[in-house]
Amino acid sequence: MRYYPAPLDHAGVEEWISRNLRRYQEHCHGLWAMILKSSCELVGDCGLTVQDVGGQREIEIGYHVRRDLWGQGLATEAARACRDYGFERLHAGRLISLIRPENVPSRRVAEKNGMTVWKDVMRQGLPHLVYAIRRDRPVEE
């Protein structure tokens, strides 16, 4: 994945699965599989994860879509569903997306989801933009 730190080895995959299981145990949410309706094929993941941003707990909308399906609106559809779930079911006051500045396609998804740049942060030694949307500022779609 182009904007992900690095591909995971076997141990990294096991740790990633364990981390996601813990997220469900602790927060009752995490990442969900993205399944293409027309073929029932796994095409990515999306969901809500708790992130530490400058010492503050934030709920992040995240998404990963298989590269050959980029540009078809799948990430936007998934991000909007996550946004609605976060506000309606989790009653979050704010949702964020952490995005590398050069990841223009992901930035477009965040903007289509009603998000705007809130601040800049460093994560894993790399600059990231924190896109955010507040529940009290409804989105016009």
Language model feature labels by segment:
Residues 9-28:
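Active-site rim helix/loop that mediates acceptor-substrate recognition in acyltransferases
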Residues 1, 6, 18, 31-141:
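Acyl-donor (CoA/ACP) binding surface of acyl/acetyltransferases
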